[in-house]
Amino acid sequence: MGKDNKKQTMLDQAQPRLQVEGLAGRRGERLLFKNMNFTVDMGEVLEVSGHNGSGKTTLLRLLCGLLLPEEGTLQWRGQPINKIRPLYHSELSYVGHTDAIKGELTAHENLMIAGALNGGGIDPEQALERVGLTTIRELPGRFLSAGQRRRLALARLLVNRAWLWLLDEPFTALDKVAIRTIATLLEEHAAAGGIAIFTSHHAINIAHARTLEISA
């Protein structure tokens, strides 16, 4: 077996785990946090809390590779992320502030495309049902309310099978029923062995979730 094949076998056998050591994040000239350390294992949910501007979004952008760390290391399956980027990105799903919904496509078509690009999860029809959007399946994205767009963006998590969910303020614009629905999806993802990290500026009741507080 070649060296590259051995390395891939070791990665495949290593359990999903995200490890952060000595991480520092900056926005412009302002240092938001430094010497951040935490580990998230299979079956865990981590809520990142803090006031607006504390660095929650910056942290998620660092974790998903949209920003480079000022200092520190990020590891996935025991390997530095910068050495296994294709694998890492194939095993994560990121939902940011912008919902990335295509306005000219229906809700169902948006999920169909997401499933075709990545896939491995449940059927788009089932995903719409899980987030309570079956009645607007044929409505173009440009006509969806802010809450409906948010739920549709989160439904993409269900059609794209990924070990790691990175969610920036996933409960924004949602009513109490929708908040409970999405919280349940996070709990089920963890129960199936997945990892979820989400930001929030107010308390969300998710079973067995840990909290990481970012304070300036």
From Swiss-Prot:
Q: What class of enzyme is it?
A: translocase
Q: Where in the cell is it found?
A: Cell inner membrane
Q: Name one Pfam family in it.
A: ABC_tran
Q: Which residues cross the membrane?
A: none
Q: Does the keyword Nucleotide-binding apply?
A: yes
Q: Give the record's membrane topology.
A: Peripheral membrane protein
Q: InterPro entries attached here?
A: AAA+_ATPase, ABC_transporter-like_ATP-bd, ABC_transporter-like_CS, ABC_transptr_haem_export_CcmA, P-loop_NTPase
**Which reaction does this chain catalyze?**
heme b(in) + ATP + H2O = heme b(out) + ADP + phosphate + H(+)
Protein EC: 7.6.2.5
Binding residue positions for ATP: 50-57
Which positions fall inside the ABC transporter domain? 18-216
GO molecular function list:
ABC-type heme transporter activity; ATP binding; ATP hydrolysis activity
State the GO CC annotations.
Answer: plasma membrane
Gene Ontology annotations of biological process type: cytochrome complex assembly
Keywords, comma-separated and alphabetical: ATP-binding, Cell inner membrane, Cell membrane, Cytochrome c-type biogenesis, Membrane, Nucleotide-binding, Translocase, Transport
Q: What is its main location?
A: membrane
Summarize the protein's role: Part of the ABC transporter complex CcmAB involved in the biogenesis of c-type cytochromes; once thought to export heme, this seems not to be the case, but its exact role is uncertain. Responsible for energy coupling to the transport system.
Q: Please report which protein family the annotation says this sequence is part of.
A: Belongs to the ABC transporter superfamily. CcmA exporter (TC 3.A.1.107) family.
Quaternary state and partners of this protein?
A: The complex is composed of two ATP-binding proteins (CcmA) and two transmembrane proteins (CcmB).
Q: What is this protein called?
A: Cytochrome c biogenesis ATP-binding export protein CcmA
